[in-house]
Amino acid sequence: MTKKLLFTFFILLNTIAFSQNISLSEKAKVSILTCGLGPESYAMYGHTGIRIQDSIHAIDVVYNYGAFDFSTPNFIGRFIKGDLQYFVTNGSFIDFYYNYQAENREIIEQVLALTPAQI
């Protein structure tokens, strides 16, 4: 399932990048955001997002994979069985940060050692 999510994420990322013709600068960074545990059943194992940051082009976005629809019938049962339909969302880092801080959940950022050509 994780491989499917990563594949979907990279397809979406490439689609967005090509559709908007975004060129990242030499200062761009990519990082993994690991979020702490939450009290709800769906947050018991934490969460992960991918952050793309480029101060030159004022880009600071998080691709949040593993999102799901809370209105799914039998949500908890399907979640426990691993039978939910997951999808990728994106939004500003500041919104992502404030959402997790409001829930008193830590965020650990690991900047990936990528060259500009790899980004």
Range-by-range predicted roles:
Residues 22-25, 119:
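Active-site-adjacent bridging/hinge elements
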Residues 4-14:
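Sec-dependent N-terminal signal peptides
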Residues 110, 114-119:
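Short, intrinsically disordered, charge-balanced linker/junction segments flanking boundaries
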Residues 25-111:
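Glycine-rich catalytic cores of cysteine/serine-nucleophile enzymes that process amide/ester linkages
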Residues 17-21:
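Boundary at the C-terminal end of the N-terminal hydrophobic targeting segment
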